[in-house]
Structure formats: structure tokens, C-alpha cells
Amino acid sequence: MFSRAGVAGLSAWTVQPQWIQVRNMATLKDITRRLKSIKNIQKITKSMKMVAAAKYARAERELKPARVYGVGSLALYEKADIKTPEDKKKHLIIGVSSDRGLCGAIHSSVAKQMKSEAANLAAAGKEVKIIGVGDKIRSILHRTHSDQFLVTFKEVGRRPPTFGDASVIALELLNSGYEFDEGSIIFNRFRSVISYKTEEKPIFSLDTISSAESMSIYDDIDADVLRNYQEYSLANIIYYSLKESTTSEQSARMTAMDNASKNASEMIDKLTLTFNRTRQAVITKELIEIISGAAALD
């Protein structure tokens, strides 16, 4: 009786390590598969970081001269103290983003401020229309503000923005048929390689500028000259916002890809440690089986 019980116990003892070994081998295969996948992802994120760094360096070089355009055009509104009369109802919001992602909260921060601005204007009884520069803004706001979109510009962010791109946006706006009284352009202003700030700058229609009290002192300003300047200043401000937004986006993407690469390195280290421990456990169990088998034969 005792011999049969001993044989049964020995059989149970010898079967259990085989199941454990199979389980550990499956775990090793899973870990190896995950390691390979994460290493491939890390290669991609490192490559994207290098590309973003090169684009960021170029964008930063081009930003300084571009700021002159925007600051100069905005100075007219500030110095002339141009304001929209309270009875004017039509307001335009231009949101600047791009078509590309993997850059943190760059696009969502602009969309968030646009939502807040649109809600405040609607509460004040204003008619609001939206222009989206970049497909990301459209995709974020389409569900909640689709009826307010006037026009959307795509193919933004694939190459550095130029003054010609800003002129096309300004021309489409002026030819859209929407006679706005006042507007605002929302974009991310570049501060440093790790910092940006979502800002809002004003834009005004030709009627608002020409009817401003401070402009009435210039009797020799022709209407065509004022219209040309208004169109040119609008293109300048759009160009300035495009350059600021592009530089902020590339720096944010570079930072995001750097963080992703670091996270991948941490995951690789942890999985490598787990792989080594699991493999060592498998080897130890196999050695125990060999020694136990040799001892049983003796």
C-alpha cells in the first residue's frame, strides 16, 4: 500500500515541473516578443526625435525674422487703440494647428481655448464662426462645433509655412463672404524648447479699422491704401502665428519622442531583467530534474 502511494506521489511530483517548464517557456517567448516589439518602437521614436530636432532647428532660425511681421502689424491695433463697437455681433475665431500628431497637448490646448472663447462669445450674444488651420483642429471640434466652421485648411505642418501660405489663408478668409466685425487668432507661442504658451491675438475687419476714431485724424489715407494695409497686416499676423505654432509643435514633438524613447528604455530594462530571471528559473528546474533523476537511478 505504501509503495503504491509512493509511486503515485512520485508521478505527481514528476509531472508538475513539466507543466511549470512549459509555462515558463511560453512566458519566455512572450517576453522575447515584447522585447522585440518595444525595441522596434524605440528605433522609430529615436528616428522621429532626430527628424523633429532638425525641423525644430530650422523653425527656430526662421521664427525670429517672422516675429517682426506679426509684432509690427499688431502694433497698429495697439497704438491706434482700435476697438470694435459693442453693437457689432459677428466674431471670427482662427485656430492654428497642423495635420500631424505625436506632439503632446499642442493641438488640444488650442482647441480648449477656442471652445472657451466660443462659449463666452455665444453667451454674450455674438455670432461666432471658426476657421481651422490644420486638420487636428477640425477633428477635435467637429463633433461639438461643426455648424460654426467656415473653412478648414489641410496639408499644414508637412513643410515649413511660408508667407505665401499665410496669404492664401487670408485671401480665402476675405473671399469667404463672411463679413466679420472682429476676430481673434489662437495659436501656441514658442517660449523655449520645453515650454510654449497658448495665446490669442486680435484681428479686425476693414470697416472696424476705418471707422476707428484714431484713424479719422489721417485725412490723406486713401480707402484703397487702408484696405491693402488691412489685408497685408492680416496675412502678416497669420504668418507670424504659423511660425510660432510650427516651432512650438516641433519642440513639443522632439520632447515627446525623447520621453517615449526613455520610457522604452525603462521597459526594455525591466523586461530584460524579467527574462533573465525566468530563464534562470527554467535552467534551475531543469538541473533539479537532472540531479533528481540521476539520484533515483543510483
Curated annotation (Swiss-Prot):
UniProt modified residues of type Phosphoserine: S146
Which is a GO BP term held by this UniProt record?
proton motive force-driven mitochondrial ATP synthesis
Q: Which residues carry this modification: N6-acetyllysine?
A: K39, K55, K115, K154, K197
Q: Which GO terms describe its cellular component?
A: mitochondrial inner membrane; mitochondrion; proton-transporting ATP synthase complex
Q: Which Gene3D superfamilies match?
A: 3.40.1380.10, ATP synthase, gamma subunit, helix hairpin domain
- Range of residues in the leader sequence: none
* Gene Ontology MF terms in the entry: proton-transporting ATP synthase activity, rotational mechanism
Transit peptide location: 1-25
> What topology does it adopt in the membrane?
Peripheral membrane protein
Instruction: Note the Pfam families from the entry.
Output: ATP-synt
* Domain of life of the native organism: Eukaryota
Keywords for this protein: Acetylation, ATP synthesis, CF(1), Hydrogen ion transport, Ion transport, Membrane, Mitochondrion, Mitochondrion inner membrane, Phosphoprotein, Transit peptide, Transport
Its subcellular locations are: Mitochondrion inner membrane
Predominant cellular place of this UniProt entry's protein:
mitochondrion
Q: Kindly list the positions at which N6-succinyllysine occurs in this protein.
A: K49, K115, K154, K270
Q: What does this protein do?
A: Subunit gamma, of the mitochondrial membrane ATP synthase complex (F(1)F(0) ATP synthase or Complex V) that produces ATP from ADP in the presence of a proton gradient across the membrane which is generated by electron transport complexes of the respiratory chain. ATP synthase complex consist of a soluble F(1) head domain - the catalytic core - and a membrane F(1) domain - the membrane proton channel. These two domains are linked by a central stalk rotating inside the F(1) region and a stationary peripheral stalk.
Similarity annotation: Belongs to the ATPase gamma chain family.
Record's subunit section: Component of the ATP synthase complex composed at least of ATP5F1A/subunit alpha, ATP5F1B/subunit beta, ATP5MC1/subunit c (homooctomer), MT-ATP6/subunit a, MT-ATP8/subunit 8, ATP5ME/subunit e, ATP5MF/subunit f, ATP5MG/subunit g, ATP5MK/subunit k, ATP5MJ/subunit j, ATP5F1C/subunit gamma, ATP5F1D/subunit delta, ATP5F1E/subunit epsilon, ATP5PF/subunit F6, ATP5PB/subunit b, ATP5PD/subunit d, ATP5PO/subunit OSCP.
Q: What is this protein called?
A: ATP synthase F(1) complex subunit gamma, mitochondrial
**Gene name on record?**
ATP5F1C
